């Protein structure tokens, strides 16, 4: 998917750590990347597929990935800080949801959605909300346990957290090779 493409664009230095495409004029005339980049209304685009129905990756596509990456990573760091937990103390990082089951660890870490330090700790659990709903419907004990757990949960407004804007801005940067 798009994360795999962005990871490769970063790896090949077609996209810089700030999320911008490299400039065509900065490439040598024999650079293979020249054939994969084009200008369209003064905006750079990457040609993913060039046959009859072109598939392009635009600067806007990269920015959308970058914003999602910044939100997820900054939320991850903010939660660690609030819980006063060091990243090295994490036993596992659980990825839930149907979407998460289709995203590789390589892409999550390669794009910087999650830090490389948790690479070996990532565990996929599938559609946990659906499983939880089934459990709540089928078991009074499970439902009671969920109710008790919900009373222990705390709400955290990321945007209102001290220093969050700076953290978010820092987390927008893509990892470098």
Spans of model-derived segments:
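Helical "lid/coupling" subdomains associated with nucleotide-phosphate turnover
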Residues: 1-177
């Amino acid at each position: 998917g798009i994360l795999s493409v962005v990871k490769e664009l970063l790896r090949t230095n077609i996209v810089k750590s700030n999320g911008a495409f490299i400039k065509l004029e900065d490439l040598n005339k024999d650079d293979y990347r020249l054939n994969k980049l084009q200008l369209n209304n003064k905006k750079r685009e990457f040609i993913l597929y060039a046959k009859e129905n072109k598939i392009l990756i635009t600067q806007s596509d990269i920015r959308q990935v970058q914003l999602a990456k910044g939100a997820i990573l900054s939320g991850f760091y903010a939660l660690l800080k609030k819980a006063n937990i060091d990243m090295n103390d994490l036993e596992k990082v659980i990825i839930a949801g149907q979407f998460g089951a289709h995203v590789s660890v390589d892409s999550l870490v390669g794009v910087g959605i999650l830090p490389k330090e948790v690479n070996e700790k990532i565990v996929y659990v599938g559609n946990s909300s659906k499983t939880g709903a089934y459990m709540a419907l089928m078991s009074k004990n499970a439902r009671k346990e969920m109710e008790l757990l919900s009373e222990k949960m705390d709400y955290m407004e990321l945007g209102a957290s001290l220093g969050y804007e700076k953290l978010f801005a820092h987390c927008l940067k893509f990892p470098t090779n």
